[in-house]
Amino acid sequence: MKVTFLGHAVVLIEGKKNIIIDPFISGNPVCPVKLEDLPKIDYILVTHGHGDHLGDAVEIAKKNDATVISNYEICHYLGKKGVKTHAMHIGGSYLFDFGRVKMTPAVHGSGILDGDSMIYGGNPAGFLITLERKKIYHAGDTGLTREMELLGEENVDVAFLPIGGNFVMDVEDAVRATAMIKPKKVVPMHYGTWELIFADVELFKKKVTEMSVECVILEPGESLEL
């Protein structure tokens, strides 16, 4: 299974089914690919409704006849645009044909900007994905939360955690989150896309390495094999 970081919070998982998380491709200043470069996508996971995460979900879904997995409110919004959806909510899990997805708590917003209006986008979330005997945790956008301690019981293989501060955890809090989650590997994300969310990724790596957690810094377009 190949897991590719495409910048910001975009993660592409290529295996028996191809899954993309938070598909902010167009307009993403650090994404190295264009929409036409993506492989066939079977599922799209959206953590919350902000434009830098909902991104190109509609276009990708329609082009590939892909199913969007997100909260009920986002799925309702996308369903009206002709997109196939599977609605879930925090704490819920479902066994798909590629594996199991569980929605986990996130502390953030989820409003959907539609023209001049802000539409209620439900509650933000993270995803715990179990597939091909591996567990991947994508935190979405979130601050530090005590619920992360429960993930420490899940034997997570790789955790994607935001570290950019301002809107999400900063380096210090992401280190604390890593200590609670106890993943085998951690990949920092949601930093450096814009100056506002600059973070010292090497400091993050140093601190989590001291906790005996492997930190994998992926530049946009780089992959790891699970």
UniProtKB/Swiss-Prot annotation:
HAMAP family: UPF0173 (MF_00457). Belongs to the UPF0173 family. It holds the Pfam family Lactamase_B_2. Keywords: Hydrolase. Disulfide bonds: none annotated. It comes from Thermotoga petrophila (strain ATCC BAA-488 / DSM 13995 / JCM 10881 / RKU-1). InterPro entries: Metallo-B-lactamas, RibonucZ/Hydroxyglut_hydro, UPF0173, UPF0173_UPF0282_UlaG_hydrolase. GO terms for molecular function: hydrolase activity. The keyword Transport does not apply. It comes from the Bacteria. The keyword Acetylation does not apply. This is UPF0173 metal-dependent hydrolase Tpet_1587. Coiled coil: none annotated.
